[in-house]
């Protein structure tokens, strides 16, 4: 039975889900889902659409199921500078503010003072 591995790559302008499996000792890759991405203004801040990104990942997982290629593992790669805070129940607290938001303007100069 073939083992499939899923990579979720979310970038600043697009995201994609790639399935991989070994064939004759080599990794074979297949893009199963691609979507546009970008920040939107929310409450005066530039934010990632967290809920929509989650839906896109689920859509990619559904596509894997439709193809009959269920991954045995999954890895997610996103930006190294953004984060969300979660409460005890795993719910997002506040907006998912992005690194390009105005709130960080001038901070690089402050670091070197």
Model-inferred region functions:
Residues 1-95, 105-106:
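N-terminal glycine/serine-rich phosphate-binding loop of ATP-dependent small-molecule kinases
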Residues 100-113:
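Glycine-rich phosphate-binding loop plus the immediately following alpha-helix
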């Amino acid at each position: 039975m073939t083992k499939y591995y899923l990579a979720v790559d979310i970038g600043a302008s697009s995201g994609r889900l790639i399935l991989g499996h070994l064939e004759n000792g080599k990794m074979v890759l297949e893009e199963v889902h691609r979507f546009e991405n970008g920040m939107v203004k929310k409450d005066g801040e530039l934010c990632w659409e967290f809920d929509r990104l989650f839906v896109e990942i689920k859509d990619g997982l559904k596509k894997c199921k439709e193809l009959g290629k269920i991954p045995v593992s999954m890895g997610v790669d996103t930006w190294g500078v953004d984060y969300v805070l979660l409460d005890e129940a795993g719910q997002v607290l506040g907006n998912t503010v992005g690194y390009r938001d105005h709130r960080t303007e001038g901070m690089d100069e402050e670091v070197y003072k």
